[in-house]
Amino acid sequence: MYDMGTRRRALALADQGRSLNSVSKETGISRAAIRSWRIRVEPLDGNRSRPCPRCRATPEDPDEPAAYAYLLGLYLGDGCISPLRRGVYSLRIACADAWPGLIDACVEAVQLLRPDNRVCRVRSAGCQYVTGSSKHWPCLFPQHGPGKKHEREIALEPWQQRIVDAHPWEFVRGLIHSDGCRVTNWTTRLVAGKTKRYEYPRYFFTNRSADILRLFTGTLDAVGVEWKQPNSRNISVAKKASVALLDTHVGPKY
């Protein structure tokens, strides 16, 4: 835990107009921590976890809806929630080692949703599991349940759909970052007697859950992205204008 002096010095650097990334590099403090201090600089007394927005007398949406929409996409693609002891649950998001930027983005999203809980990176073969413990993950992700996601119904609660409608690109980005990819296809044509090679990018999204595929395509429809479904598990985006939209709002994994 950082003392108040350290917190205020980091915030003072950020208040000078510097980016959170530069402040993080200078101080060694994560961007998520600095961002959370802008909301509340004082550490919480006693209980590390602030009240869950869904458990209040009148349930409210998460304080960081854009981060929530992104994390929801990651969870539906490569996440799981497991019970620990004393009513605590562990959220785990599998992130490939090949994309360190995605791992950082996942850590930041988890930290923003539960800023007073520790976020860990657990190494495994070829990947890292971004994990965080809280009693409230099932409140925030009611899709949690026994069995595999593709073997049970997956539907958004009205409050979740409202967040996705407000932040559709974050939701799409989370889904593609978990179960999607951007690839470059190519073809050849004979032009003026010479064979020329043409390359064109496209996006794929793969998931065994028909419900999750429908959530993905429904959101693509909402943002004007054209798509096709070549088989029961894959969604393809190949139209030039639609690929350009995804490049603008999602982009290749990094």
What are these regions (language model features)?
Residues 1-254:
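Internal intein/HINT superfamily modules and their associated LAGLIDADG
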